[in-house]
Curated annotation (Swiss-Prot):
SMART domains the record matches: STI1, UBA, UBQ
Covalent link (Glycyl lysine isopeptide (Lys-Gly) (interchain with G-Cter in ubiquitin)) residue numbers: K122
Gene name of the record: Rad23a
Organism: Mus musculus (Mouse)
Protein name: UV excision repair protein RAD23 homolog A
Lineage summary: Eukaryota, Metazoa, Chordata, Craniata, Vertebrata
Biased composition, class Low complexity, residue ranges: 126-147
């Protein structure tokens, strides 16, 4: 007796395939390819997941006891056109892939550029070595070729209501919420990378230890970059940068908004950071001091690298302020309320759901 298999992609597209119980998973993949197209759903690139397990090609469908009321997740591991695949540590510096996942900027328009001497002191050969990265890590900044690429990179992340929806979708594969949250955090909210982590193992500790990202990075710095020659060193002692780093470590859901802010307001600095990804990530992963409030950081974003009189502040309308006050009345600290409110694109209901689902502890 034929059964109906409901399938759902990570983009939340749902479709159904009729199968005979004795037919194998491989046959199901072939039917998916035939219906959806070889380019989008090649058999070789498909991974079918049910109840947290990858379905084996040679196993009959009936062996997995798939409930027709539930669904099988279809994940395609084929690389998208225009996006690079992380290169191995031995890759040549001249073949630089475009990162598949953007790394969050923590800076904005007011941030000063690094001292020009940091570039003038290098020979042309050194410059070509230090301004191209031989790897694309999960937390890399986007290639600085064009604003279009920055937008493409930002589109791979989820935030706000999309974050909560994606969290639920991945949990429906059979994973616990804690592990899904850890995988999303490790992948900087890239759902495809997060599922890969759940299947192959989350880098480092399953707990959100920020040092694991730093420890997982290969390879060593190029020989021409001696220790202490970090061109982004000028950021380290700036209080605004320190506060922004702390806020990002507290709430990774703010990463997409900050990425867009940097790309729009200070593309030159984004270019500089993209040339020195490893140093920037190491600085961002350094242990924070006292916790910072997003309300403080939002006003300081434009002042990094400049004098205090040039600080920019984010203004909120009276309606937005009332919404923030109502969220605070639910019992959450103001800093967390503001984080959630802006992360959910100023949608009060989504922010409330986000706060309640995260089970934040009062600071």
């Amino acid at each position: 007796m034929a059964v109906t298999i409901t399938l759902k992609t990570l983009q939340q597209q749902t479709f159904k395939i009729r199968m005979e119980p004795d037919e194998t998973v491989k046959v199901l993949k072939e039917k998916i390819e035939a219906e959806k197209g070889r380019d989008a759903f090649p058999v070789a690139g498909q991974k079918l997941i049910y109840a947290g397990k990858i379905l084996s090609d040679d196993v009959p469908i009936k062996e997995y006891h798939i409930d027709e009321k539930n669904f099988v997740v279809v994940m395609v591991t084929k690389a998208k056109a225009g996006q690079g695949i992380p290169a191995p540590p031995e890759a040549s510096p001249t073949a630089v892939p475009e990162p598949s996942t953007p790394f969050p900027p923590v800076l904005a328009s007011g941030m000063s550029h690094p001292p020009p001497t940091s570039r003038e002191d290098k020979s042309p050969s050194e410059e070509s070595t230090t301004t191209t990265s031989p790897e694309s890590i999960s937390g890399s900044v986007p290639s600085s070729g064009s604003s279009g690429r920055e937008e493409d990179a930002a589109s791979t992340l989820v935030t706000g209501s999309e974050y909560e929806t994606m969290l639920t979708e991945i949990m429906s594969m059979g994973y616990e919420r804690e592990r899904v949250v850890a995988a999303l955090r490790a992948s900087y909210n890239n759902p495809h990378r997060a599922v890969e982590y759940l299947l192959t193992g989350i880098p480092g500790s399953p707990e959100p230890e920020h040092g694991s990202v730093q420890e997982s990075q290969a390879p060593e710095q190029p020989a021409t970059e001696a220790a202490g020659e970090n061109p982004l060193e000028f950021l380290r002692d700036q209080p605004q940068f320190q506060n922004m780093r702390q806020v990002i470590q507290q709430n990774p859901a703010l990463l997409p908004a900050l990425l867009q802010q940097l790309g729009q307001e200070n593309p030159q600095l984004l270019q500089q950071i993209s040339r020195h990804q490893e140093q920037f990530i190491q600085m961002l992963n350094e242990p924070p001091g006292e916790l910072a409030d997003i309300s403080d950081v939002e006003g300081e974003v434009g002042a990094i690298g400049e004098e205090a009189p040039q600080m920019n502040y984010i203004q909120v309308t009276p309606q937005e302020k009332e919404a923030i006050e109502r969220l605070k009345a639910l019992g959450f600290p103001e800093s967390l309320v503001i984080q959630a409110y802006f992360a959910c694109e100023k949608n009060e209901n989504l922010a409330a759901n986000f706060l309640l689902s995260q089970n934040f502890d009062d600071e």
